[in-house]
Amino acid sequence: MTNLLENTNLLTAIITPFDKNNRIDFQVYRRLIDSQISDGVKGFVISGTTGEAPTLSHDEKIELFKRTVDFVSGRAKVIVGTGSNNTKETIEFTKEAGRINGIDAALIVTPYYNKPDQAGMIAHFSTIADESPLPIVIYNIPGRSISALTVESLLKLADHPNIIAVKQCNSDYDMSELIEHAPKDFLVYTGEDGQSFLNYALGGAGTISVASHFYAKEFADMFSAIDNGDFKKAAGDFRFINPRVKALFSYPSPAPVKAVFKRSGIDVGIPRLPILPLDKAQTDGIMQVLKL
């Protein structure tokens, strides 16, 4: 069976811009989406970590989903973050999102804070997938959620017909094992920009990226080089990207991305608390590395 995300190797985990009144700035948001698509991005993850999902209200998320579909207008895939550590609420919210025409899939994070075991997480994702009108992309990010799905658990979930991919933010070894053993129609993405070369070179699906806000063309060139068997060029592209990735994650995300946009002439506002904006010295340090 063909996966609807097949050949979607670069997705941006897009920021949520805010205006001076701390409301979502949809005019700037539309500009970002158009620019990203022009630069080669093939999809977007909305209301994820980089999109400041924890500080967005339910109504803000729904409006953001609707506006995204309108702005994208079929030019790229749209994946929306609907997950939480409450299975019932996740099902209800995913169903609500599923009533918006143009959304391709839902990103569901591993349950945080309540720390279920592997059996509990398998039950969580299976129950959501059974009820969801949208295909599910698992978001396995133990660095933020504490709970980590093992390779064995992910392979069990990969057999569910409504679970189509994983955004894997874990070790190189786990990612490699998933790529090796997952069904062919189950896609293994990395959510770590620093794993982008390794993931794609090993046969993974690509990257759900933060650095692609500024380096989408470089990511696209790297993936194209790998597709063409030119690993020397791809490695060079990655060596260019990698130190810039480190700089963009030198402070809590998405504060660096927002600071760089503002310094570059696009005011996307500041993060909502508890993430603080960067000061001038912090931004200067990042800009010296990025050289935009």
UniProtKB/Swiss-Prot annotation:
Coiled coil (UniProt feature): none
Matching Pfam families: DHDPS
Marked site positions, Part of a proton relay during catalysis: T49, Y113
Catalytic activity from the UniProt record: L-aspartate 4-semialdehyde + pyruvate = (2S,4S)-4-hydroxy-2,3,4,5-tetrahydrodipicolinate + H2O + H(+)
Metabolic or biological pathway: Amino-acid biosynthesis; L-lysine biosynthesis via DAP pathway; (S)-tetrahydrodipicolinate from L-aspartate: step 3/4
Keywords: Amino-acid biosynthesis, Cytoplasm, Diaminopimelate biosynthesis, Lyase, Lysine biosynthesis, Schiff base
UniProt cross-references to Gene3D superfamilies, sorted A to Z: Aldolase class I
InterPro entries: Aldolase_TIM, DapA, DapA-like, Schiff_base-form_aldolases_AS
E.C. code: 4.3.3.7
The keyword Disulfide bond belongs to this UniProt entry's keyword annotation: no
Similarity annotation: Belongs to the DapA family.
PANTHER family, per the entry: 4-HYDROXY-2-OXOGLUTARATE ALDOLASE, MITOCHONDRIAL, DIHYDRODIPICOLINATE SYNTHASE
Name of the molecule in the record: 4-hydroxy-tetrahydrodipicolinate synthase
Gene: dapA
